[in-house]
Amino acid sequence: MSKLQEIIIEAFERRADITPRNVETHVKDAVMEAIDMLDRGTARVAEKKDGEWIVNDWLKKAVLLSFRIHDNQFIKGGFTNYYDKVPSKWADANSRDFREGGARVVPPATARKGSYIAPGVVLMPSYVNIGAYVDSGTMVDTWATVGSCAQIGKNVHLSGGVGIGGVLEPLQAAPTIIEDNCFIGARSEVVEGVIVEEGSVISMGVYIGQSTRIYDREKDEILYGRVPAGSVVVSGNLPSKDGKYSLYCAVIVKKVDEKTRSKVGINELLRDI
């Protein structure tokens, strides 16, 4: 464990006593270093190792501590102003910073300090919260939201109005993860640490949390908290045992084929900056 991790973990244990006025310099410096690491993408709240997603809880603790050590402050917004503890990711950016960063940011898209936006990302008017990681080639479409610490893979399309849940508390919960080459349909919600594995397609209006039944009709089995790689998922219902009513579920109707991929493929013309 690094010294940085030790400082943050120790401070988190006494977080209730920490305020912007009494926080020690070394704690504040450690928290801001962790936030900067998240902001640059050199550290991630969750990362895949040997096929498994590993959560770095100490970084989640750093994000939570950042709210304890800052007062709300006046934040200029050009056409409007804000009042918050966390500044905008690009509060002090100039045109050169944007060119070197390689992402396209369409007004009034917002990303908070401590989120990472990789080169080749397109942010339509959308929102990316602190601790989130958005990888290269991804489109975050209009009114989509990427919650705190959520992990979005490469070449993902988050359609209009999509909600990707944030998970800062409880700390043992894993963040919501959308792996590479996924398509999330308009107005769908993926929350509570659910993992959508690589190459999956989620249809419009599908809601998936940890308690949502995910029914694989080919295998006639029910999953929770995970959409297997290459799945095509739509909203549906499963009947009760007595047949008197049905309850919502997500249905895996098939695995992705080339025809489906061609329909949801990334439009490179829209990604070129």
Swiss-Prot record:
<keyword id="KW-0677">Repeat</keyword>
<keyword id="KW-0457">Lysine biosynthesis</keyword>
<dbReference type="GO" id="GO:0008666">
    <property type="term" value="F:2,3,4,5-tetrahydropyridine-2,6-dicarboxylate N-succinyltransferase activity"/>
</dbReference>
<feature type="binding site">
    <location>
        <position position="141"/>
    </location>
    <ligand>
        <name>substrate</name>
    </ligand>
</feature>
<dbReference type="InterPro" id="IPR011004">
    <property type="entry name" value="Trimer_LpxA-like_sf"/>
</dbReference>
<dbReference type="GO" id="GO:0016779">
    <property type="term" value="F:nucleotidyltransferase activity"/>
</dbReference>
<dbReference type="GO" id="GO:0009089">
    <property type="term" value="P:lysine biosynthetic process via diaminopimelate"/>
</dbReference>
<keyword id="KW-0963">Cytoplasm</keyword>
<keyword id="KW-0028">Amino-acid biosynthesis</keyword>
<dbReference type="InterPro" id="IPR001451">
    <property type="entry name" value="Hexapep"/>
</dbReference>
<dbReference type="GO" id="GO:0005737">
    <property type="term" value="C:cytoplasm"/>
</dbReference>
<dbReference type="InterPro" id="IPR018357">
    <property type="entry name" value="Hexapep_transf_CS"/>
</dbReference>
<keyword id="KW-0220">Diaminopimelate biosynthesis</keyword>
<dbReference type="Pfam" id="PF14602">
    <property type="entry name" value="Hexapep_2"/>
</dbReference>
<keyword id="KW-0808">Transferase</keyword>
<comment type="pathway">
    <text>Amino-acid biosynthesis; L-lysine biosynthesis via DAP pathway; LL-2,6-diaminopimelate from (S)-tetrahydrodipicolinate (succinylase route): step 1/3.</text>
</comment>
<keyword id="KW-0012">Acyltransferase</keyword>
<comment type="subunit">
    <text>Homotrimer.</text>
</comment>
<protein>
    <recommendedName>
        <fullName>2,3,4,5-tetrahydropyridine-2,6-dicarboxylate N-succinyltransferase</fullName>
        <ecNumber>2.3.1.117</ecNumber>
    </recommendedName>
</protein>
<dbReference type="InterPro" id="IPR023180">
    <property type="entry name" value="THP_succinylTrfase_dom1"/>
</dbReference>
<feature type="binding site">
    <location>
        <position position="104"/>
    </location>
    <ligand>
        <name>substrate</name>
    </ligand>
</feature>
<comment type="similarity">
    <text>Belongs to the transferase hexapeptide repeat family.</text>
</comment>
<dbReference type="InterPro" id="IPR037133">
    <property type="entry name" value="THP_succinylTrfase_N_sf"/>
</dbReference>
<dbReference type="Pfam" id="PF14805">
    <property type="entry name" value="THDPS_N_2"/>
</dbReference>
<dbReference type="InterPro" id="IPR005664">
    <property type="entry name" value="DapD_Trfase_Hexpep_rpt_fam"/>
</dbReference>
<dbReference type="GO" id="GO:0019877">
    <property type="term" value="P:diaminopimelate biosynthetic process"/>
</dbReference>
